[in-house]
Amino acid sequence: MIAFDPRSTEERVRIVDLHPDLGDIRAEATDGLRRNQKKLPCKYFYDALGARLFEAITELPEYYPTRTELGIMNASVHEMAEAIGGHATLVEFGSGVGLKTQKLLDALIEPTGVVLVDISRAALEASAYQLADRYDDMEVIAVCADYTQALRLPRPNRPSARTVAFFPGSTIGNFTHPEAISFLGRVAELVGRGGGLLVGIDRRKDTEVIENAYNDSLGVTAAFNLNILRRLNESGANFDLGKFRHHAPFLEHEGRIEMRLISEVEQSVRVGTSSFSLQAGEHIVTEHSHKYDLSQFEDMARSAGFRLTKHWSDARDWFSVCFLEVDDD
């Protein structure tokens, strides 16, 4: 339930551009391909085609994370809202257009405002005005920034009881463990004393279930993975996409899926003025997705200054939504 705010949509939307470094795909790819284990930066998956492909992935029967997390929120969002409490400021790391964000905002008790943080200004502006139209009684602040870096965020004009961040989608699993702990530590500083974080995590489970989710029978994930090579070709590379295949094994010891592009033949590729040789069967790593035991994630959160106070899971314990609160002791 949200209190009425008589200001117009335009008056309730604030756009703050921190001018994030958008990166140089060619330079970052060149650096990654020079390493002993060749890799490419996963942030370049998401051009317009990549975003559409990922949306299609979330609808696949094998891909359980999205629908499982949404099911948890459908069942428990009012308990989540009670844990957050009334008159909170919600900070979402993302553009805020998803169903999960709307479900949470619908359940929150008179939130003072929502702060969206995303690197794409165009996506932010569009979603900020959509949210302001939907919630005609709440201030929306859109911050164009890289949320993986240290930030100081603007606050809504109305006083807030606490600040709570929202990070759904098991996106935290794309970080290495040290990176995840560093990110959680920055979030703890961002939300401050009394603050919290509602975060989705993908749980450890049967290896076949995990691998099927990232190696779907229709080949949509393969197209998504190969799209990064197409993007590089737009920037002066010469990858032949037909000479690569997608594979995403689960690495048991590391507890993560590893997205790979495997060279089908011995070949040489060019990125800008740099050339790289690949042996037949050699792979390029494009993304990691860590799966957690709940106790493991609790230890990581504690290392970052949080304590796990509540969590909600599906009946099979495939996925959990965790509520962390800043440990003020």
Model regions and ranges:
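N-terminal auxiliary segments of SAM/dcSAM-dependent transferases
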Residues: 1-44, 51
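Conserved class I S-adenosyl-L-methionine
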Residues: 87-96
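Conserved beta-strand signature within the Rossmann-like core of class I S-adenosyl-L-methionine
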Residues: 190-204
